[in-house]
């Protein structure tokens, strides 16, 4: 088992990465609470709930709340259902919430933990690649609103993150590929050598080779832990992690949450960011081609929806959380392994990138 530390003073926590961790009692023995409330969904529950409950049996009493699967259920109505379940059973602040699932479950459970009785501990147990390398680490918790993705939320750090690489063997191919979009993102914004490693290990990753997966997950978590330790609440360098997300969130909102997987939207958004950087003279054409080719290797889209006009993008992008002083801020790659934050990109240039004539 590998361990990576997120250093945030008295709120620091470990990320545990290994094979078959969910079957091992020692995985959960460090939990502070003797009462655990598991939040999961109706897809993950049949796969992993029994083994997690068995691993917890000797160290905590366990209750379970099962949500319907899907991004469309990441809303205030389903969040309220979690609160109602906790209140009806009189759970107090000595309860630990455990998020067993992908990014939707992790985001909702974390936000519920941040709000319930003004804050209770929670643990992230991500079961998708996207959640393992990105959303489970760093304390971003939220639900969606019809007018924007993740618009209602809080920064609230987990007690720990438990990543079992065996979970990836049950993922549908499209979900695995969507997770690779976030993996590739780390190479683009932060680590050119990792990007090259990804280019050279496509076959091993697609074959779910344990060693390759563990290396990639640990590398992503280490990068994110470093960034979050420097900038927990996204006042500076953490914003780089949003490469592709400004365009991507616009795609998700326009097409309806769940119709495009988050990773698919991030892939298309990252290519739009790279093309914007090319148009501005920040990035060379070969780097854009490498970015496109790596996303293509995992069957990810490199173009946004044909039905989506420039005006559709702009309507949603103006509501983006990174907007500052009414200016859209874009994360743009400057080279493979390096990115920056840019405001006031000319809208005529963006229009040409998004809908080239």
From Swiss-Prot:
UniProt enzyme class: lyase
Native source species: Shewanella denitrificans (strain OS217 / ATCC BAA-1090 / DSM 15013)
Signal peptide: none
Keyword Transmembrane: no
Subcellular location per the Swiss-Prot or TrEMBL entry: Cytoplasm
Described purpose of this protein according to its UniProt entry: Catalyzes the conversion of 3-deoxy-D-arabino-heptulosonate 7-phosphate (DAHP) to dehydroquinate (DHQ).
GO CC annotation terms, alphabetical: cytoplasm
Protein name: 3-dehydroquinate synthase
GO biological process, one term: chorismate biosynthetic process
Cell inner membrane as UniProt keyword: no
Pathway info: Metabolic intermediate biosynthesis; chorismate biosynthesis; chorismate from D-erythrose 4-phosphate and phosphoenolpyruvate: step 2/7
One of the Pfam families matching this protein, by short name: DHQS_C
CDD domains linked: DHQS
Keywords in alphabetical order: Amino-acid biosynthesis, Aromatic amino acid biosynthesis, Cobalt, Cytoplasm, Lyase, Metal-binding, NAD, Nucleotide-binding, Zinc
Gene that produces this protein: aroB
Source species, domain of life: Bacteria
Catalytic activity entry: 7-phospho-2-dehydro-3-deoxy-D-arabino-heptonate = 3-dehydroquinate + phosphate
Lineage: Bacteria, Pseudomonadati, Pseudomonadota, Gammaproteobacteria, Alteromonadales
Main subcellular location of this protein, as a coarse class: cytoplasm
Family according to the record: Belongs to the sugar phosphate cyclases superfamily. Dehydroquinate synthase family.
């Amino acid at each position: 088992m590998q361990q990576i530390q997120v250093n945030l003073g008295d709120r620091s926590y470990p990320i545990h990465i290994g094979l078959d961790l969910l079957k091992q009692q020692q995985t959960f023995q460090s939990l502070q609470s003797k009462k655990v409330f598991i939040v999961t969904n109706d897809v993950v529950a049949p796969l992993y709930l029994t083994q997690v409950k068995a691993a917890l049996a000797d160290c905590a009493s366990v209750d379970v709340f099962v949500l319907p699967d899907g991004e469309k259920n990441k809303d205030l109505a389903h969040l309220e259902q979690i609160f109602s379940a906790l209140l009806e059973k009189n759970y107090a602040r000595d309860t630990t919430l455990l998020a067993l699932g992908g990014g939707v479950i992790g985001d909702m459970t974390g936000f519920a933990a941040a709000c319930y009785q003004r804050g209770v501990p929670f643990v992230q147990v991500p079961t998708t690649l996207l959640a393992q390398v990105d959303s489970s680490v760093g304390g971003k918790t939220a639900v969606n609103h019809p007018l924007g993705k993740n618009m209602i939320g809080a920064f609230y750090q987990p007690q720990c993150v438990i990543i079992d690489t065996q979970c990836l063997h049950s993922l549908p191919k499209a979900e695995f590929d969507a997770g690779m979009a976030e993996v590739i993102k780390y190479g683009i914004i932060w680590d050119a050598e990792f990007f090259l490693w990804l280019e050279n290990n496509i076959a091993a990753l697609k074959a779910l080779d344990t060693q390759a997966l563990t290396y990639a997950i640990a590398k992503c978590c280490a990068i994110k832990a470093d960034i979050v330790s420097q900038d927990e609440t996204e006042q500076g360098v953490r914003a780089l992690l949003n490469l592709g997300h400004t365009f991507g969130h616009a795609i998700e909102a326009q097409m309806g949450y769940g119709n495009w997987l988050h990773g698919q939207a991030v892939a298309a958004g990252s290519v739009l960011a790279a093309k914007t950087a090319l148009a501005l003279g920040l990035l060379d054409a070969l780097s854009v081609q490498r970015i496109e080719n790596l996303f293509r290797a995992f069957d990810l889209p490199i173009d946004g929806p044909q039905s989506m006009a420039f005006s559709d993008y702009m309507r949603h992008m103006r509501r983006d959380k990174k907007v500052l002083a009414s200016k859209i801020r874009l994360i743009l790659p400057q080279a493979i392994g390096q990115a920056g934050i840019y405001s006031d990109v000319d809208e005529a240039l963006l229009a040409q990138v998004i809908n080239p004539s």
